[in-house]
């Protein structure tokens, strides 16, 4: 993640773009890491490694009520069931912290995981993770993120070498390290808090994959923020754009050029070829 990027949970991003909240940039957050009992050695080591290498301020608490995330995947996308999030929110209310990291097993079949790694497609864990972090963030109003823990079945498969194959480069980071907590802690370390600071008025442009349309898009459209749609980055979503007028870009390289042109005050049509003739308006 580059230095000028901000790590923001989805529901907080929605509210920010809708003008309901502002975001305050910080130098450091105190992170609370919540886990099911007992805290696993790999989880403790992950927290220790970020404290030693990044100087992160973090501590772990064990949940009194087990948190369960059950992933579901079909042609429409990834979703799932979250059990125990209300009890989690109640328990963490007794602690002082700035950001919350949740780490737990996501109940997904080994076959589903294997199909994802070998064939690509929809991340089977992402949907239920988003549901969990959104529910919690909405209630505690603090930066929140979830990291999966490897199941015992997956650990046994690791020992047998069943995961030793080449995957799509975009998901390679997920298979080379089975403790996913480090990146979450790194992101939450300086994640902006809800408070006086950046507002939707500071946003110049939104860049979106093709076919996507949700609360962030609607908020940007309402606020008059240009939306760049990257056509090469296709998803399972197929939202039509007939009602709006996005800026079309073939790829992210072109999108970067569009943003640079906007920032320099250059009309986009002037750098496209062929260049249209100047219009003469009749009175």
Please provide the spans of the model-predicted regions.
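Metallocofactor- and cofactor-centric catalytic cores in central/energy metabolism, strongly enriched
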Residues: 1-102, 107-116, 122, 126
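Low-complexity, flexible helical/coil segments
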Residues: 19, 26-27, 66-71, 134-141, ...
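Gly/Ser/Thr-rich loops at beta-strand to alpha-helix junctions
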Residues: 36-41, 101-110, 121-130, 148-155, ...
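Predominant activation on well-ordered alpha-helical scaffold segments within soluble catalytic domains
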Residues: 44-48, 130-137, 182, 214, ...
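Structural alpha-beta junctions
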Residues: 48-64, 95, 134-145, 222-229
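Generic multipass alpha-helical transmembrane bundles of integral membrane proteins
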Residues: 73-80, 92-93, 103, 115-191
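A polyampholytic, Gly/Pro-enriched intrinsically disordered region
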Residues: 78-87, 165-174, 246-258
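C-terminal functional extensions of proteins
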Residues: 151-153, 179, 183-205, 209-283
């Amino acid at each position: 993640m580059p230095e000028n990027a901000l790590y923001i949970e989805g529901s907080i991003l929605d509210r920010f773009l809708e003008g309901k909240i502002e975001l305050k940039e910080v130098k450091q957050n105190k992170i609370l890491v919540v886990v099911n009992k007992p805290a696993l050695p790999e989880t403790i080591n992950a927290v220790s490694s970020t404290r030693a290498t990044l100087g992160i301020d973090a501590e772990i608490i064990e949940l009194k009520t087990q948190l369960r995330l059950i992933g579901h995947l079909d042609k429409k996308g990834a979703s799932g069931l979250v059990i125990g999030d209300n009890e989690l929110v109640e328990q963490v209310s007794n602690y002082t912290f700035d950001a919350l990291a949740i780490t737990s097993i996501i109940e997904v079949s080994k076959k589903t995981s294997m199909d994802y790694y070998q064939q690509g497609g929809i991340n089977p864990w992402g949907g239920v993770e988003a549901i969990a972090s959104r529910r919690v963030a909405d209630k505690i109003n603090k930066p929140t993120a979830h990291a999966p823990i490897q199941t015992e079945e997956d650990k046994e498969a690791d020992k047998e070498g069943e995961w030793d194959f080449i995957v799509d480069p975009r998901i390679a980071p997920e298979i080379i390290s089975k403790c996913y907590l480090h990146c979450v802690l790194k992101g939450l370390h300086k994640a902006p808090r809800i408070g006086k600071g950046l507002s939707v008025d500071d946003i110049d442009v939104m860049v979106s994959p093709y076919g996507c349309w949700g609360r962030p898009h609607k908020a940007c459209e309402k606020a008059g923020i240009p939306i760049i749609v990257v056509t090469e980055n296709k998803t399972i979503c197929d939202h039509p754009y007939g009602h709006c007028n996005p800026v079309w870009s073939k790829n992210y390289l072109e999108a970067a050029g569009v943003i640079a042109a906007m920032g320099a005050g250059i009309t986009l049509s002037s750098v496209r070829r062929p260049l249209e003739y100047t219009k003469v308006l009749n009175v």
